[in-house]
Amino acid sequence: MSSYENHQALDGLTLGKSTDYRDNYDASLLQGVPRSLNRDPLGLTADNLPFHGADIWTLYELSWLNSQGLPQVAVGHVELDYTSVNLIESKSFKLYLNSFNQTRFDTWETVRQTLERDLRACAQGNVSVRLHRLDELEGQPVAHFHGTCIDDQDISIDNYQFTTDYLQHAVSGEKQVEETLVSHLLKSNCLITHQPDWGSIQIQYRGRKIDREKLLRYLVSFRHHNEFHEQCVERIFNDILRFCQPETLSVYARYTRRGGLDINPWRSNTDFVPATGRLARQ
């Protein structure tokens, strides 16, 4: 259980509550969650963040009416900057997108600008939005995370409670290595509803070699942990940086979609360009 799971800042969220679906545009449906909720316990403040990054959202269920009433569909790509005051709560995002369904917009650009304006207001930070026609995306191959998968280890696990203990003394040798490690076994739970969130994670670092068994045990320990996607990625970044002390570090997770949305947060302290192709489970 997260230390802030019952924080009053979460009281007003529609997440976990019965809600009506509106199909006429309503920006008030968007709800933000302060990033400080998970950053404060980690000792992170806006002026001492050890990373940069973004939350990348893919919007698969986006539709509206053109000026003549003909339905339009698109796939949206949203990038929410890590410096925003709030992250966007996903159920409210879904409800907000549904409100476009029976609303007329003159142009695609008007839709894009509307999304960008509303998301920036909710997040209190920088947001960029791109809209793609379906024929732009047809035929795109399923992508994969570059790196060495650490999942196929012959180990026994019987503890699924989150702990950083596995990262203590998890590095060895004095030689600097540079490697990219991948796991598809990341599973955490929604902070509010405790529904499972499934993801794949890519960890790039340069530093003393990290023990792969200990790293995998640490990642598996999220299995009963309740936090939002973005919060988990920041926790993983912070824990690896704290205990393993790599010179450079990038952590990137791509989660399976829910409600027509997938969330793909990344954090890095070096030059890092995230590949945005959808993975096999997305």
Swiss-Prot record:
Organism name: Salmonella agona (strain SL483)
Reactions performed catalytically: 7-aminomethyl-7-carbaguanine + 2 NADP(+) = 7-cyano-7-deazaguanine + 2 NADPH + 3 H(+)
Protein name per its UniProtKB record: NADPH-dependent 7-cyano-7-deazaguanine reductase
Compartment(s): Cytoplasm
Single GO cellular component term: cytoplasm
GO molecular-function terms, A-Z: preQ1 synthase activity
HAMAP family with a match to the protein in the record: QueF_type2 (MF_00817)
Annotated disulfide bonds: none
Active site: residue positions: C190, D197
Binding site for substrate: I88, E89, S90, H229, E230
A Pfam cross-reference name: QueF_N
Functional note: Catalyzes the NADPH-dependent reduction of 7-cyano-7-deazaguanine (preQ0) to 7-aminomethyl-7-deazaguanine (preQ1).
Main location: cytoplasm
Key words of the record: Cytoplasm, NADP, Oxidoreductase, Queuosine biosynthesis
GO biological-process terms attached to the record: queuosine biosynthetic process; tRNA modification
Subunit structure: Homodimer.
Assigned EC number: 1.7.1.13
Positions annotated to bind NADPH: S90, K91, R258, G259
